Amino acid sequence: MTVIDVLPQTQRALKIVGPNAVSVNAAAPLPDIEPTDVLVRVVCVSINPVDGKAADMSPQLGATSGTDFSGVVVALGADVEADNWREANTMKPVRIGDRVFGGIFGNDPLRPHNGAFADYVAVPARLVWHIPTGTDFATAATMGAAIATVGLSLFNYLGLPLPSKSKAGLPVVTTCSAASSTNVLQLGAEAWFDYKSPTCGADIREHTNDSLAFALDCITDTASMGICYEALGSAGGRYVALDAFPVRGHTRRSVVPEWVCTPTQFGKAIRWTPPYDLEPRPYDLKCAELWYVVAQRLIDEGLIASHPLEKRNGGLSAVPEGMEEVRRGQIKGKKLVYTILDSEPIAVSA
């Protein structure tokens, strides 16, 4: 293993201590570094709804919480330097001192010392992105899980072709609130529809001339599933949810439903409580690796916009309060970001 400097024996980590309960452990072990991993000194983290939801629905006592991170590579697993996969796919290799971001599987009973809400996080070298010049750690920390989820959802579960060029060229319509409409149109949506409207699904079907074939449900409750099913054309199509969908919402035989659990991108089993107890999905890993190549190009070209963010003070100790705000639905249209490390590790490369 190659390291930037002498690593500490312990770290600060936000640990699951009970249902919907987390606490900072100031003397937690560092995560083990697998041969294909890089170890990242975390600079910033952001909160996703899944962080609190996982601690509530499937708490793994003693596991480190957290998904999204950005930071600096401080150690390489034994096989990383010899693996030329990134170079073969026109990606810059990951080396010590690189600024990177990504998402990891926190609250993992099979790897309890690894999670984003900590001083250090281990992540596969193939499944991490470089932070482009001009992008700060706070902004990068908002994007990892979102980009990974989009890739699995669109190009694996919905079955859309992975774009060979910068853009897929597919027309997009979306639901949102009126307050977010200008933003989504600027980001490239063809049209937006108010999800609170009782005619939302019908309006989308009319706008798309009864031809909509693919729906991605980022909310996944009975109401959002109903909108998607009504919006899909009479010929049917594919519906993908970002959570286990309510079976009673599957009201059309012509629609094929699926749901995404993004940690399957790592190709390992997930041992949460049902329905989140999943066997390894090697094809999800393969798809993720291909998508990360395309996504890095989109990131470098400035074609992926970050989510609006709110920087919070207090560092790691303040993250539990933010998790609770997100869990209660008090944070809308933005992501909370916390700085874990005030200065970068030494010997950072350009």
UniProtKB/Swiss-Prot annotation:
Record function comment: Trans-enoyl reductase; part of the gene cluster that mediates the biosynthesis of ilicicolin H, a 4-hydroxy-2-pyridonealkaloid that has potent and broad antifungal activities by inhibiting the mitochondrial respiration chain. IliB collaborates with the hybrid PKS-NRPS synthetase iliA to assemble the backbone of ilicicolin H. The PKS portion of iliA and trans-acting enoyl reductase iliB work together to construct an octaketide, and two methyl groups are introduced by the MT domain of iliA during the chain assembly.
Q: What's one GO MF term for it?
A: oxidoreductase activity, acting on NAD(P)H
- What is one Pfam family matched by this protein? ADH_N
Q: List residues binding substrate.
A: 145-152, 262-266
Q: Copy the pathway line from the protein's UniProt record.
A: Mycotoxin biosynthesis
- PANTHER family (UniProt xref): HYPOTHETICAL OXIDOREDUCTASE (EUROFUNG), TRANS-ENOYL REDUCTASE APDC
**Which gene is this protein's source?**
iliB
Question: What is this enzyme's EC?
Answer: 1.-.-.-
Entry-linked InterPro entries? ADH-like_N, GroES-like_sf, NAD(P)-bd_dom_sf, PKS_ER, Trans-enoyl_RdTase-like
The positions annotated for binding NADP(+) are 50-53, 177-180, 195, 242-243, 331-332
**Subunit description:** Monomer.
Q: What is this protein called?
A: Trans-enoyl reductase iliB
Q: Which family does it belong to?
A: Belongs to the zinc-containing alcohol dehydrogenase family.
Q: Which SUPFAM superfamilies does the protein's record reference?
A: GroES-like, NAD(P)-binding Rossmann-fold domains
Keywords, A to Z, come to: NADP, Nucleotide-binding, Oxidoreductase
- Reaction it catalyzes: N-[(4E,6E,10S,12Z,14E)-6,10-dimethyl-3-oxohexadeca-4,6,12,14-tetraenoyl]-L-tyrosyl-[ACP] = (3E,5S)-3-[(2E,4E,8S,10E,12Z)-1-hydroxy-4,8-dimethyltetradeca-2,4,10,12-tetraen-1-ylidene]-5-[(4-hydroxyphenyl)methyl]pyrrolidine-2,4-dione + holo-[ACP] + H(+)
